[in-house]
Swiss-Prot record:
Biased composition (Basic and acidic residues): 17-28
Function per UniProt: Substrate-specific adapter of a BCR (BTB-CUL3-RBX1) E3 ubiquitin ligase complex that mediates the ubiquitination of target proteins, such as NPTXR, WNK1, WNK3 and WNK4, leading most often to their proteasomal degradation. The BCR(KLHL2) complex catalyzes ubiquitination and degradation of NPTXR. Responsible for degradative ubiquitination of the WNK kinases WNK1, WNK3 and WNK4. Plays a role in the reorganization of the actin cytoskeleton. Promotes growth of cell projections in oligodendrocyte precursors.
Pathway where it operates: Protein modification; protein ubiquitination
Tissue: Ubiquitous. Detected throughout the brain.
Known partners and oligomeric status: Component of the BCR(KLHL2) E3 ubiquitin ligase complex, at least composed of CUL3 and KLHL2 and RBX1. Binds actin. Interacts with KLHL12. Interacts (via N-terminus) with FYN (via SH3 domain).
Species per Swiss-Prot/TrEMBL record: Homo sapiens
Protein name as catalogued: Kelch-like protein 2
Region spans: Disordered: 1-28
Record's keyword terms, sorted: Actin-binding, Cell projection, Cytoplasm, Cytoskeleton, Kelch repeat, Repeat, Ubl conjugation pathway
Kelch repeats: 308-353, 354-400, 402-447, 449-496, 497-543, 545-591
One biological process term in Gene Ontology: protein ubiquitination
Gene that encodes the chain: KLHL2
UniProt xrefs under PANTHER family: KELCH PROTEIN, KELCH-LIKE PROTEIN 2
Length: 593
């Protein structure tokens, strides 16, 4: 029996029409076949024709570079060329078209992109590639350049990228660079780019409510540094700049000891008026301060950047290279690039977007080497060595300089102190402390550097004494002693208060904690930690004080706990480090974007 013919696939059963039917309803039921490789294959062939100079109908000239191409391809991909070749301009008929605004190599890259959809953006070419892509209206290339620049944002270049984005109408990149500068203000102001800004740009930056700063003193010191960079020209702008510094939010001691003594303030009657306003604010009862409304009494409201706690090296039980980070948001630890060499008992700071591991012990020698870690590149680099070998030292940042305080050189405890200038990559000595201090803890409050406790090898005693350094006078001064001797205490700063955590006095390892208030020059006890710790790392983040690792007198600890000053309680973090470590360097950084 013969099989009956099947009805056409595109028609309804019982209502067949001839193939040349004009009924549009038939087409609605026909599947459309799309070949995803067709366009790619076509452009590949067109590019091969171009490379052989076949069917080319125009030569694009830039400088001494001549590039053969097809008008229809250029017009299809670039609105710039579309307008050129379809309009009434003479170029629409010309065999050779010269483009003066773009260099030859850049133009070749962009025409290659038109045919291949491939382009490589690098640090070397992005500044010429982006404006050229803008000229040719190749928006995808321009977007790729902007994304590349966004990935390169760093405290040393974000202001330059912001200016570049503004010049070339890259609105999204401009906003992201501006936000980055606000979020990394404390490091940005240490850069050459900041010092070279114009007055309008400085005012715009420091007036932002979104600045992420630990204290308003960062803004004041930035203003002084900017003016002093070209003092003869810029000192006339002091009053205008100080209008945006929120002096009432600074501690009274800082106003008296630093702001009032600054020559640039003394020489300006308007600046003195702002200082008087700030002092009046401090004299008012708390309930009346809210009535004194001005832009300078308004708290800044920064966007909180995600934070990471970085734990570098340490003793586990020997000196190690391992570096791990704790993500506060994800509540987990992860490993990052190891130190170039083993290091424990080092000083640790975060400055200018970099983590610095200063001095320490490599398992056999006390060292004076310094390594810096770039979180964006996940890479360690060596910088200038200190002048002296130091382990169990304290390290802190004051007025843009990294200070290495005291320590042990292998034979004796040290009272000497040296400072590192990141711009010149040089170390220099400053005034020594009054007492030799190894296993010393340090912190900065109100523009002063504090050295807390430690061990004096001369007297062979753990210390309860504390002294502070004034960089303006280059002098160390004793302040109130702690209630107990502490060597190897963790020291941290939270809410303009100085905390001394744990430590030991001889064989006795402590869990007690005391806090110093510079306004009263007095120490007071707060809640004990959950466990005894000495040689632990301390850092403050999000209103909490974290204590990391250390040892309890018998073993190294992998645990972490934090102190909440509101509740006066310590809480153990559920996630521990991968290994117990004491004498590790600890600091908090902004999570790389």
């Amino acid at each position: 029996m013969e099989t009956p013919p099947l009805p056409p696939a595109c028609t309804k059963q019982g209502h067949q029409k001839p193939l040349d039917s004009k009924d549009d309803n038939t087409e609605k039921h026909c599947p459309v076949t799309v070949n995803p490789w067709h366009m790619k294959k076509a452009f590949k062939v067109m590019n091969e024709l171009r490379s052989q100079n076949l069917l080319c109908d125009v030569t694009i000239v830039a400088e001494d570079m001549e590039i053969s191409a097809h008008r229809v391809v250029l017009a299809a991909c670039s609105p710039y060329f579309h307008a050129m070749f379809t309009g009434e301009m003479s170029e629409s008929r010309a065999k050779r078209v010269r483009i003066k605004e773009v260099d030859g190599w850049t133009l070749r890259m962009l025409i290659d992109y038109v045919y291949t959809a491939e382009i490589q953006v690098t640090e070397e070419n992005v500044q010429v590639l982006l404006p050229a892509a803008g000229l040719l209206q190749l928006q995808d290339v321009k977007k790729t350049c902007c994304e590349f620049l966004e990935s390169q944002l760093h405290p040393v270049n974000c202001l330059g990228i912001r200016a570049f984005a503004d010049m070339h109408a890259c609105t999204d990149l401009l906003n992201k660079a501006n936000t980055y500068a606000e979020q990394h203000f404390a490091d940005v102001v240490l850069s050459e780019e900041f010092l070279n800004l114009g007055i309008e740009q400085v005012c715009s930056l420091i007036s932002s409510d979104k600045l992420t700063i630990s204290s308003e003193e960062k803004v004041f010191e930035a203003v002084i540094a900017w003016v002093n960079h070209d003092k003869d020209v810029r000192q006339e702008f002091m009053a205008r700049l100080m209008e945006h510094v929120r002096l009432p939010l600074l501690p009274r001691e800082y106003l008296v000891q630093r702001v009032e003594e600054e020559a640039l303030v003394k020489n300006s009657s308007a600046c003195k008026d702002y200082l008087i306003e700030a002092m009046k604010y401090h004299l008012l009862p708390t309930e009346q301060r809210i009535l004194m409304k001005s832009v300078r009494t308004r708290l800044r409201t920064p966007m909180n950047l995600p934070k990471l706690m970085v734990v570098v090296g340490g003793q586990a039980p020997k000196a190690i290279r391992s570096v791990e980070c704790y993500d506060f948001k994800e509540e987990r630890w992860h490993q990052v690039a190891e130190l170039p060499s083993r290091r424990c008992r080092a000083g640790m700071v975060y400055m200018a977007g970099l983590v610095f591991a200063v001095g320490g012990f490599n398992g056999s020698l006390r060292v004076r080497t310094v390594d810096s870690y770039d979180p964006v590149k996940d890479q360690w680099t060596s910088v200038a060595n200190m002048r002296d070998r130091r382990s169990t030292l304290g390290a802190a940042v004051l007025n843009g300089l990294l200070y290495a305080v005291g320590g042990f050189d292998g034979s004796t405890g040290l009272s000497s102190v040296e400072a590192y200038n990141i711009k010149s990559n040089e170390w220099f000595h400053v005034a020594p402390m009054n007492t030799r201090r190894s296993s010393v803890g340090v912190g900065v409050v109100g523009g002063l550097l504090y050295a807390v406790g430690g061990y004096d090898g001369a007297s062979r005693q753990c210390l309860s004494t504390v002294e502070c350094y004034n960089a303006t006078t280059n002098e160390w001064t004793y302040i109130a002693e702690m209630s107990t001797r502490r060597s190897g205490a963790g020291v941290g700063v939270l809410n303009n208060l100085l905390y001394a955590v744990g430590g030991h006095d001889g064989p006795l390892v402590r869990k007690s904690v005391e806090v110093y208030d510079p306004t009263t020059n007095a120490w007071r006890q707060v809640a004990d930690m959950n466990m005894c710790r000495r040689n632990a790392g301390v850092c403050a983040v999000n209103g909490l004080l974290y204590v990391v690792g250390g040892d309890d007198g018998s073993c190294n600890l992998a645990s972490v706990e934090y102190y909440n000053p509101t509740t006066d309680k310590w809480t153990v973090v559920s996630s521990c480090m991968s290994t117990g470590r004491s004498y590790a360097g600890v600091t908090v950084i902004d999570k790389p974007l």
